Structures are given as structure tokens and as C-alpha cells.
Curated annotation (Swiss-Prot):
This is Methylenetetrahydrofolate--tRNA-(uracil-5-)-methyltransferase TrmFO. Its EC number is 2.1.1.74. The gene is trmFO. It is found in: Cytoplasm. It comes from Lysinibacillus sphaericus (strain C3-41). One of its GO terms (molecular function) is tRNA (uracil(54)-C5)-methyltransferase activity, 5,10-methylenetetrahydrofolate-dependent.
Amino acid sequence: MTEQVVNVIGAGLAGSEAAWQIAKRGVKVRLYEMRPVKQTPAHHTDKFAELVCSNSLRANGLTNAVGVIKEEMRILDSVILKAADQCSVPAGGALAVDRHEFAGYVTEAVKNHPLVEVIHEEVTEIPEGITVIATGPLTSKALAEKIQGLTGLDYLYFYDAAAPIIEKDSIDMDKVYLKSRYDKGEAAYLNCPMTKEEFDRFRQALIEAEVVPLKEFEKEIYFEGCMPIEVMASRGEKTMLFGPMKPVGLEDPKTGKRPYAVVQLRQDDAAGTLYNIVGFQTHLKWGPQKEVLQLIPGLENVEIVRYGVMHRNTFINSPKVLEKTYQLREQKNIFFAGQMTGVEGYVESAGSGLIAGINAARLALGQEPIIFPFETALGSMARYITEAQSKNFQPMNVNFGIFPELPPGRRSKPERAEMHATRAISTIHNFVNSQTI
């Protein structure tokens, strides 16, 4: 056992998982949690890993990427997955939990580990030494200022304004065309042209679609200069035409004419399998959101891998500042974990905490931090958040679209999912067996 102590700031899902992974490797942990001394607007208890929104950890089967990441975490002795499996409630094919039992299980497991010291106080200065920052979307203002000092002022954000991300394979390429505005540079956008009738129908559907109600602590986000597409639609017929749906300079090469309106799709990942819908940040509920997007020519059969969202968040521009080990590039003793890194979702947050914890422990023990294979769900998340387009970086759930491509061949969607899952689980087993993790 080393005498070095690793600091973990925040006892949410990511921080609790990181602390557990560090301690089980024989390294002392100093775990800071400001609740109940100082509460956040979203939490209601002083327990670790409190689930503040849904009690579902989403799909449990291996036909879904989130099911795969959960299985990988079980293989790596995740305390979050232990708690979830122990405290599960009936939910069909999903893994849902009794949130009070779940938080209680995690709290007791982490607190009772002999190498974990829990300190209930607000952290306003980043401690010396090896530190994992896992303070979540509601990071306190004082600490956020210190994080800005570490990452640079331009690389810390305070809200999500994410447009939907879709699978390229679900786009009808016969209805779209590749072109950049005024043909500047290489043709970098897929363009979905609309007639006036199509635009009017689309705009009306946007106005009538059901939105997610804002929480009290989220109501300031529109003043940051980023407006939801449905708000633009409601402000008048021309608002979107002078904004994200502006057709100027985007003549359709098939007709030589300018469409009435254009929806632009921009490549989102290095592999070119995912595209985001430019300027379409939205507060629409997911069901209505898909129905509205299917009115866009070329997207009638769209597969959405991340729905558009707008909510209060605190996250860093990971492609600019983070390594795939979850270390800060410029200060290798600092790790980030959880939603702060740009992973989205309970399970993904815990998964990032698992990797950050393993690597913080390795650093404390004088070992090299490790990068998880990209064929795994854990590795693909780490790769996505560090290789995504930094200019438009927004948080992302795990999905098969961010995994490395499969060998060539025509396959159904279930067949592709099965191949991704089989490869991921085989890879994580081989990785664990070949490393001292």
C-alpha cells in the first residue's frame, strides 16, 4: 500500500466510483462532498450517488450500447453496478433501481471502506497532489472559477445547448446534397432542401410540439445567447430563415435553384458515421422531437443517437484539454470524471469515474495510466470526448455510432449491435487479463 493519498471531489456517481476503484487498489482516498453542509438546487439528501432525475439506468441487454458499458463495468467490479443490481426494481428490459436503497448502498460501501476518508465541506481550492474532480453539472461557483483557471476561460461551459446527432446510415442520400455555403472550402455539409410548403408544415409542427418544462435553476440559460429552435419558430415565419435554415448560397446542384429553406447536417465524428443538425438546439420532448425531425426531407427514417437538449450543466471542452486517461493534458496529476467531462448519463458518468479512478490509483502507485481499447464502450466514450469537434463539443451518451466501424458487409441493425457487443465484451476480458488493472 502506498502512503500517497488521492483526493476525489464530489460523491456523485462518478466520484463514488472513482473513490471505490482507487481504494480497492490499496490507495488512500480523501473524498470531499459538500452536502449536507451546502446543498445544490437539485439534490435532496446527503447520500452519495443520489439519482436526481430518473431512477432508470436504461437498457440492460447487450443489444444496446448502454447495456454493453454496464457489462464492462460489472467485469471491472463497479460499485455503482453492484448497487444497481442489488437494488433493482422491475422495469422490463431496463435496469431501474429503488433510488433510496441505491444511494444508501453506495454510501455505505464507499464510506465503510477502510481506505476512504470522507470530508463534508465545500471545496473552493483544488488540493495539492493527485486529484479527481467529479463535481457534476451543478458545480459550485467558487470551484468552477478554479477549474477555469486550470482549463482556460474559454474551455468551461455552464449549460448544454445540444442539437440532435443522427446516424449517417439513416439519411436518405437521394434527397440531400453535399455543399458548403457559397462553395467556400470543401463541401462539408449535407443539405436538406425544403419547399415553402414543407417549411410551413415543419414550422407549425415545431410550434405545436411538447417541450420539456424548465427547472427553476435552469431558467437563465436562454440569456447565454443560444435560442431553442422551437422558440425561433414561434417568433415569426422569417426567424429561422435568417438563422439556421438560411438558404442563401446553398443552391441545389440538381436544379441549380435556391431552396426556400435548408437544414444543414455537419459531420460530428472522425469516422463520419454521425451528423449533427446545425443550430437545432431544442427543449422538445424526445417523442415529439423525432416526429418533427422526420418532417425534414431526407430524414424521414432518421435514427437519433443523441436528442437535442438544453439544460444547466458544467462541463469542460474535453477535446481541447483532456487525455483519454481522463487526465488534464497540462497537469497530469489532475483527473476529471462524470458529466464534467462531457459524458452524458448516469452510467456513462460512473464509467468515466471508473477509468479516472483506476488511472489515479495507478499514478499514485508509480504505474503508467492506461487507455481502454476503443472497441469497448468505456474506451469509445473516452475516445469520443477527447477527439470530437472541439468547436462544437457537446455532451454525449454512449451509443454504437461512436464505436469503431465493423468489418465491411451488409447487416441489419440487430446484427450490427450484436457484433459490437460481442467484440466489446471479448476485448474488455482480454484487456483485463493482459493488464494489471
